[in-house]
């Protein structure tokens, strides 16, 4: 059986973390979970530790000191997942904006030939719920901007709901990934694209969080906007 792990970064997710873990474990297929916990003061880590008694073989956690950023959380998770022999590695938010029931659809896309499957809000129009119209417009046109500048045929360039084949993460030089916020999502897709891997978008409906606090900020969008120009000029090479 394929070994599959869902990486879930957390910071102050006590309202969501137990529910999202149980939702993933309720799926058929034997998914494991790796929580990357960035020192949440609200007790998120304690909730996960208590659940590890119930799921000792399939629930893992890496605790980091302080809020170190989305990109570094996933890089840490990618390295751990590859080192521990997982075949398919997922990214997913803790707040149910990504529907756990879509996880098997991303997995199936990779089984059918994709190297990276993206849960896409924009490949079939705009499929977003509970966002203010201004944020929808900003996110959609940010993806248009990225697609235009980088020449990458991906509609949802900032999507954070993904499934990688392990070969992709073994090939990308993860130590040279520079962006830390949502620009990280762009950089990883662009690296995957430039290294010749097959990317497939799977349509999803994105529902903004109903509990907890959003981690989005203008600085995150700024990094993504300016980072794209530097990314365009950078030569992407596989890890040696």
Place the predicted regions along the sequence by residue.
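Catalytic donor-sugar/metal-binding loop of nucleotide-sugar-dependent glycosyltransferases
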Residues: 152-153, 176-180, 189-206
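N-proximal low-complexity "stem/linker" segments adjacent to membrane-targeting elements
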Residues: 1-23
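Acceptor/aglycone-binding surface of glycosyltransferases and processive sugar-polymer synthases
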Residues: 62-83, 88, 100-182, 209-226
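Acidic helix N-cap motif at the loop->helix transition within catalytic regions
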Residues: 15-19, 42-51
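Short beta-strand/loop segment that forms part of the nucleotide-sugar
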Residues: 21, 30-40, 62-63, 92
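Terminal low-complexity segments of carbohydrate-biosynthetic enzymes
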Residues: 3-5, 101, 108, 112, ...
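Cell-envelope/extracellular polymer assembly enzymes that use nucleotide-activated donors
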Residues: 3-5, 32, 187
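A conserved acidic beta->alpha catalytic loop
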Residues: 37-46, 96
């Amino acid at each position: 059986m394929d070994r599959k792990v869902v990486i879930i970064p957390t910071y102050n997710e006590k309202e969501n973390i137990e529910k999202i873990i149980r939702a993933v474990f309720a799926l058929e297929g034997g998914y494991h979970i790796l929580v990357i916990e960035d020192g949440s003061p609200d007790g998120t880590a304690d909730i996960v530790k208590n659940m590890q008694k119930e799921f000792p073989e399939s629930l893992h956690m890496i605790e980091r000191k302080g809020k170190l950023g989305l990109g570094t959380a996933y890089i840490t998770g990618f390295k751990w997942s590859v080192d521990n022999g997982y075949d398919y590695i997922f990214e997913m938010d803790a707040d149910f904006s990504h529907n756990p029931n879509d996880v098997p659809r991303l997995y199936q896309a990779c089984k059918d030939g994709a190297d990276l499957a993206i849960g896409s809000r924009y490949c079939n129009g705009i499929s977003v719920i509970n966002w203010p119209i201004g944020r929808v417009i900003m996110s959609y046109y940010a993806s248009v901007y990225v697609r235009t500048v980088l020449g990458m045929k991906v509609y949802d360039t900032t999507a954070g709901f993904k499934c990688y084949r392990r070969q992709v993460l073994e090939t990308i030089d993860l130590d040279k990934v520079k962006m830390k916020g949502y620009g990280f999502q762009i950089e990883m897709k662009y690296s995957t694209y430039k290294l010749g891997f097959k990317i497939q978008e799977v349509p999803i409906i994105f529902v903004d969080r109903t509990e907890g606090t959003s981690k989005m900020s203008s600085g995150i969008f700024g990094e993504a906007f300016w980072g794209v120009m530097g990314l365009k000029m950078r030569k992407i090479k596989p890890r040696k």
